[in-house]
Amino acid sequence: MAKIKARDLRGKKKEELLKQLDDLKVELSQLRVAKVTGGAASKLSKIRVVRKSIARVLTVINQTQKENLRKFYKGKKYKPLDLRPKKTRAMRRRLTKHEEKLKTKKQQRKERLYPLRKYAVKA
């Protein structure tokens, strides 16, 4: 099999990708048998290409799966941990913008009764 390009894989359905993955794995096992039995050098160099192709197919499968999960959980209140933004621990525990703006009744009353004084400077 020739080297597979990831952009060609992205248009395919999951069933097609899984079938291609199985084909590549079978081919890899055949190449490994050829290696043990003393096969041609061309077959030995092909092992690397097939391994990388398997990795490409798996990468595309995983990326599309994660993309679909992101679409599913978009707008929902709770998301799985691996779909949440990766921040530092401190940033995750920080108050939200809304929580920071909240004021107690006492604080609201004080601000209403004693507004900030504005002074005019005589020039």
From Swiss-Prot:
Entries under InterPro entries matching the protein: Ribosomal_uL29 (IPR001854), Ribosomal_uL29_CS (IPR018254), Ribosomal_uL29_euk (IPR045059), Ribosomal_uL29_sf (IPR036049)
Numbered residues of crosslink Glycyl lysine isopeptide (Lys-Gly) (interchain with G-Cter in SUMO2): 25
Pfam families: Ribosomal_L29
Alphabetically ordered keywords of this record: Acetylation, Cytoplasm, Isopeptide bond, Phosphoprotein, Ribonucleoprotein, Ribosomal protein, Ubl conjugation
GO annotation, cellular component aspect: cytoplasm; cytoplasmic side of rough endoplasmic reticulum membrane; cytosolic large ribosomal subunit; cytosolic ribosome; large ribosomal subunit; synapse
Gene3D superfamilies associated with the record: 1.10.287.310, 6.10.250.3450
Modified residues (N6-acetyllysine): 19, 43
GO molecular function, one term: ribonucleoprotein complex binding
Subunit structure, interactors included: Component of the large ribosomal subunit.
Task performed by this protein: Component of the large ribosomal subunit. The ribosome is a large ribonucleoprotein complex responsible for the synthesis of proteins in the cell.
Family: Belongs to the universal ribosomal protein uL29 family.
Protein name: Large ribosomal subunit protein uL29
